[in-house]
Amino acid sequence: MLINGWSGSGGDAFPDYFRKKQLGPLIGSRTWGGLIGISGVPELIDNGSITVPTFRMYNTDGTWFKEGHGVDPDILVEEDLAAMAKGTDVQLERAIKEIIGLIKSKGFKVPPIPGYEKRN
């Protein structure tokens, strides 16, 4: 899974759960680290607004999800903006390389397609 600092909120939680289920490597750079959410944005008389944290995520074991740090990758690949400006995404290229390596070493089997459901 590709991750970087633009991944936040669910983009922090999903890679964490992906890792805990050992579904594959996390490739890229650390996620943003923001999982305390807001609900509603009251407007102020000067047309500004204010937000107040109102909820937070926790793990399935009942512990709080680590706020403020993000999820570290298994394979660190920093973004290269100069390469990206030339059309090369070094994080994506590394992920493709890793996936090809995993397919070669572990194989790949297409899961069966379920039959169509009957809706009445």
Task: Please tell me what each predicted stretch does.
Residues 1-120:
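C-terminal "post-core" interaction segments
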